[in-house]
């Protein structure tokens, strides 16, 4: 059960103070309910419009919002509910859209290309500072709107052909959920 900001004793207003990452599962439940009731029935063009609208909303939240990023959703405050909902609507709908229109391309070493891409993107420190939140928001927008979907597309197109890569991928897959 989510904790309201007044009930959370550490003062960081986490929705799930005993298990911080559970906030994302909270939004996944909402996404699954929306999918079951509405989103799965949307025609592909309407789904694309939803992705575009949610992406624009999330970009506006990142660039002009209170944090200068999309790190929101972990608390039951207005800003966090708005940010978390936009994150859910964009990523969930974009994933569904990608699954509908996906046509694989040949990518040699996709797992290594995608891994390097993720490391490079996540290694960039916060940009701009308190006076220029918009700069980091713009970087976050470029990541979620262009870079991350491209990495997912390339990764989904790739095939592991050698034993070493297959073993590494299996190991990473096996530990990903327990670490989460």
Where are these regions (language model features)?
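Alpha-helical transmembrane segments in multi-pass integral membrane proteins
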Residues: 8-11, 38-42, 71-180
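Membrane-interface helix-loop-helix regions
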Residues: 1-29, 57-67, 71, 78, ...
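Short active-site segment of divalent metal-dependent hydrolases/proteases
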Residues: 30-32, 90
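Small-polar-interrupted transmembrane alpha-helices in polytopic inner-membrane proteins
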Residues: 46-66, 114-122
């Amino acid at each position: 059960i989510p904790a309201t900001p007044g009930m959370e004793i550490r003062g960081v207003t986490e929705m799930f103070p005993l298990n911080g990452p559970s906030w994302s599962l909270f939004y996944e439940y909402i996404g699954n309910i929306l999918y079951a009731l509405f989103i799965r029935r949307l025609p592909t063009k309407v789904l694309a419009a939803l992705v575009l609208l949610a992406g624009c909303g999330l970009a506006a939240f990142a660039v002009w919002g209170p944090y200068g990023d999309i790190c929101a959703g972990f608390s039951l405050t207005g800003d966090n509910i708005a940010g978390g909902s936009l994150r859910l609507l964009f990523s969930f709908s974009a994933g569904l859209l990608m699954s509908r229109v996906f046509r694989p391309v040949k990518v040699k070493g996709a797992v290594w290309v995608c891994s390097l891409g993720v490391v490079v993107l996540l290694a960039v420190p916060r940009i701009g500072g308190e006076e220029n939140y918009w700069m980091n928001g713009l970087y976050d927008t470029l990541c979620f709107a262009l870079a991350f979907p491209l990495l997912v597309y390339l990764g989904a197109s790739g095939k592991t052909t050698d034993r070493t890569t297959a073993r590494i991928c299996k190991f990473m897959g096996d530990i990903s959920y327990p670490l989460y």
